[in-house]
Amino acid sequence: MSYLIPYVIEQTNRGERSYDIYSRLLKDRIVFLGTPIDDQVANVVIAQLLFLESEDPDKPVNLYINSPGGSVSAGLGIYDAMQHIKSPVNTTVVGMAASMAALLLAAGTGKRYALPNARVMIHQPHLSGVGGQVTDIEITAREAVKTKQLMAEILAKHSGQSVERILADTERDRWMSAQEAVEYGLVDEVLHPREKASRSAR
């Protein structure tokens, strides 16, 4: 199902200029990951991260996430780019960060945020479409075990949990509320609505 991407019209000294909404957000150093993660999506996100670093390596990048996860290899490509660039990457989950997207949320190199009703889910990598000769299946299974260990080590590094705890908790889908994600170490802070926060401070 396709949907229309909104355009924003801005006035410049040369007249009107239109941007698709994602390009306009990029001007403010905002990258939005709002789809399942595949190779094409990962390439776009990585390109945006590299571009923003080249623009100003000292300014933070804000990565907003609303994704059910997806390809492990594609997600690890985004993860490596986040760790590679000099610009700090703040991550914020809006809606959902599940599976590979939860790892990217936790791996923010700046601040890591969740909106109040966001959900976070971690689990072990899934095998799909496995077939062929027994030897090929054995090779795939060994690679899957290595990937499971790698993902657990990355989550442990960024959450402060032990690898053993991560492995145990990801045996099945582990869903968390925004506050539970803070307590688990995947998120630093829950962002509450600005107006209510400012009223309560009076």
Curated annotation (Swiss-Prot):
GO function terms (MF aspect)? ATP-dependent peptidase activity; ATPase binding; serine-type endopeptidase activity
> Which one GO biological process term can you cite for this protein?
protein quality control for misfolded or incompletely synthesized proteins
* Reaction(s) catalysed by this chain's protein: Hydrolysis of proteins to small peptides in the presence of ATP and magnesium. alpha-casein is the usual test substrate. In the absence of ATP, only oligopeptides shorter than five residues are hydrolyzed (such as succinyl-Leu-Tyr-|-NHMec, and Leu-Tyr-Leu-|-Tyr-Trp, in which cleavage of the -Tyr-|-Leu- and -Tyr-|-Trp bonds also occurs)
Q: Active site at which residues?
A: 99, 123
Task: Extract the InterPro entries matched here.
Answer: ClpP (IPR001907), ClpP/crotonase-like_dom_sf (IPR029045), ClpP/TepA (IPR023562), ClpP_His_AS (IPR033135), ClpP_Ser_AS (IPR018215)
Q: Which Enzyme Commission numbers does its entry carry?
A: 3.4.21.92
Location in the cell reads:
Cytoplasm
Task: List GO terms (cellular component aspect).
Answer: cytoplasm; endopeptidase Clp complex
Could you describe the subunit structure of this protein?
Fourteen ClpP subunits assemble into 2 heptameric rings which stack back to back to give a disk-like structure with a central cavity, resembling the structure of eukaryotic proteasomes.
Q: What is this protein called?
A: ATP-dependent Clp protease proteolytic subunit 1
**Species for this entry:** Symbiobacterium thermophilum (strain DSM 24528 / JCM 14929 / IAM 14863 / T)
